C-alpha cells in the first residue's frame, strides 16, 4: 500500500452520503457524523421510536465471553453493547427498525466460538455476528462466518483481520489492531525509557502479535530485543519466568491477560524490588483491576498503553463524557453502581463504535434482509468507508478506515502510574500507526 494512500485527512466523513429520505435516517446522520455534539441533540430522535418499534427488528448476534479467561471483558462488553443499543433504539433504531441483541456465551473458547457463530446464524437467524474479542476465539470463529456468508464484526485488536488471514465477511472497524498500536508508541518508548527491551506476553495469537510487531518495530527503530518470554494465559504463578529476564534490560514490556494478572504484577514487584528496569505495559494486564489494589505499589512510575483513558481527566471531551455516562462508568473508571467493579475502559468503547458502524453501513447500503444481495451491498458499502468522525458514535477519536483490509486506525494513549492512578503523558497521531500492506479483501468473491 503506497504511503500516500494512508495520509490522514481530518476533513469530515468520507463515506458515501447518507440518504435523507426519512426523518429517521436524518437522525442517524446527526449522530453518525458527530454533528450532535451534545446529548440534548439526540432527543430529536425520540419521536420516531414508535415507528421503529413497528418494523421487523434487526437482530445482532453477540458472541460474548461471559465465562472463561475473557469474562471480565465480556461483562463490560455486554454492558457497553446494552447501552449503545438502548441509545440506537431511543433515536429511531437502524433504518427505522428496532435493534434486538441475541447473546451467546462462547466461554472464551475457540471450539465453542465457531459453534456460537453457527448457532447465532442458523438457529437464531441473526442479521450479523458481532463482539468477539479474544484472538484465538476470533481466528477459530471467523472461518465459520465466511462459510455461512454472514458478516462478522469483531472487537478484538488482533492483527488477524488486517493480515488478510480471515475472509471478506469479517470486519474490525471499531478498534485498532496490535500492529498499529505498537507501531504508534514504539518511538516514544525507545526515546523515553530505553533501547534494550525484554518482552513478556501471553502464549497465543494476541501475544504473538505483540512479539512480532513491537519486537519488529523496536529493531526497525534501532533498538534491541534481548529476550521474548511467552507465558500460558492460564498460568497462576510467574516466579519461574522473571529470572530469565536479562540483567541489562532497560525496558520490560509486558502484556498479560487472564485470571493471574494481579499475581503477575505482584510477583514482578517482589522479584525486582527497587532495582527494576523501566516498565511499559499494555493495560490489558490490568483491565478490570483497581490501580489501588494491594501489591500494585510497585507500578508507581511505570507506563501503560491505553486505548481510551480509564480516568475521566485523561481525554475530557464531551463525547467521551457522554459515552462514560451512558455505560455507567464513574470518573475513576469503575461502575457507578459499584465502585469496586472496575471497567475494561481501554477496550470496551470498541463495542459502542462498532454498533454505530453497523448502523451506518445498514442505512447507507439499503440492507433489509439476510439475502446474498443485501449482504453484498452492505459489505461493499462498508469497504468504501474511509473515515469515522470523532463524536457521540466514536468517542475514542477519529478513525481512518481502510476498506481493503477491513481495519480502522486511530489515536493511542500512553499513561504513567502516578499516585495509584493513570495519568496520560502522550497521545499519538493516526499517521504514527499506519503500516504498508498488500492485503485486499475486496478481491475475494462473496
Describe each PLM feature range.
Residues 2-7, 14-30, 38-446:
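Extracytosolic ligand-binding ectodomains
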Amino acid at each position: 500500500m503506497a504511503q500516500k494512500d494512508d495520509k490522514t485527512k481530518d476533513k469530515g466523513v468520507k463515506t458515501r452520503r447518507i440518504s435523507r429520505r426519512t426523518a429517521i435516517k436524518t437522525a442517524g446522520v446527526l449522530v453518525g457524523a458527530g454533528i450532535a455534539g451534545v446529548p440534548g441533540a439526540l432527543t430529536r430522535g425520540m419521536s420516531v421510536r414508535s415507528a421503529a418499534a413497528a418494523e421487523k427488528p434487526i437482530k445482532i448476534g453477540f458472541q460474548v465471553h461471559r465465562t472463561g479467561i475473557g469474562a471480565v471483558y465480556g461483562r463490560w462488553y455486554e454492558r457497553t453493547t446494552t447501552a449503545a443499543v438502548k441509545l440506537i433504539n431511543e433515536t429511531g433504531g437502524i433504518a427505522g427498525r428496532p435493534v434486538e441483541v441475541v447473546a451467546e456465551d462462547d466461554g472464551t473458547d475457540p471450539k465453542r466460538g465457531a459453534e456460537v457463530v453457527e448457532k447465532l446464524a442458523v438457529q437464531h437467524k441473526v442479521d450479523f455476528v458481532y463482539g468477539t474479542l479474544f484472538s484465538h476465539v476470533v481466528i477459530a470463529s471467523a472461518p465459520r462466518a465466511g462459510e455461512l456468508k454472514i458478516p462478522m464484526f469483531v472487537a478484538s485488536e488482533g492483527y488477524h483481520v488486517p493480515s488478510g488471514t480471515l475472509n471478506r465477511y469479517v470486519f474490525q472497524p471499531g478498534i485498532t489492531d496490535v500492529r498499529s498500536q505498537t507501531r504508534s508508541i514504539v518511538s516514544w518508548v525507545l526515546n523515553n525509557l530505553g533501547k534494550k527491551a525484554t518482552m513478556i506476553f501471553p502464549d497465543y495469537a494476541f501475544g504473538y502479535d505483540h512479539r512480532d510487531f513491537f519486537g519488529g518495530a523496536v529493531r526497525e527503530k534501532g533498538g534491541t530485543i534481548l529476550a521474548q518470554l511467552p507465558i500460558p494465559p492460564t498460568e497462576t504463578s510467574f516466579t519461574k519466568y522473571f529470572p530469565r529476564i536479562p540483567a541489562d534490560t532497560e525496558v520490560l514490556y509486558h502484556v498479560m491477560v487472564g485470571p493471574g494478572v494481579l499475581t503477575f504484577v505482584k510477583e514482578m514487584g517482589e522479584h525486582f524490588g527497587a532495582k527494576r528496569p523501566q516498565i511499559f505495559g499494555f493495560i490489558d494486564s490490568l483491565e478490570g483491576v483497581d490501580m489501588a489494589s494491594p501489591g500494585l505499589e510497585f507500578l508507581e512510575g511505570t507506563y501503560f498503553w491505553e486505548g481510551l483513558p480509564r480516568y475521566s481527566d485523561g481525554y475530557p471531551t464531551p463525547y467521551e463524557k457522554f459515552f462514560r455516562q451512558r455505560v455507567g462508568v464513574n470518573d475513576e473508571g469503575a461502575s457507578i453502581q459499584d465502585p469496586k467493579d472496575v471497567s475494561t475502559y481501554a477496550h470496551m468503547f470498541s463495542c459502542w463504535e462498532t454498533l454505530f458502524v453497523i448502523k451506518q453501513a445498514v442505512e447507507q447500503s439499503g440492507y433489509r434482509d439476510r439475502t446474498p444481495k443485501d449482504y453484498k451491498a452492505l459489505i461493499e458499502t462498508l469497504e468504501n468507508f474511509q473515515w469515522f468522525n470523532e463524536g457521540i458514535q466514536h468517542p475514542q477519536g477519529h478513525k481512518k478506515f481502510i476498506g481493503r483490509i477491513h481495519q480502522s486506525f486511530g489515536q493511542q494513549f500512553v499513561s504513567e502510574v502516578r499516585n495509584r492512578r493513570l495519568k496520560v503523558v502522550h497521545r499519538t497521531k493516526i499517521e504514527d500507526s499506519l503500516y504498508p500492506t498488500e492485503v485486499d479483501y475486496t478481491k475475494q468473491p462473496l
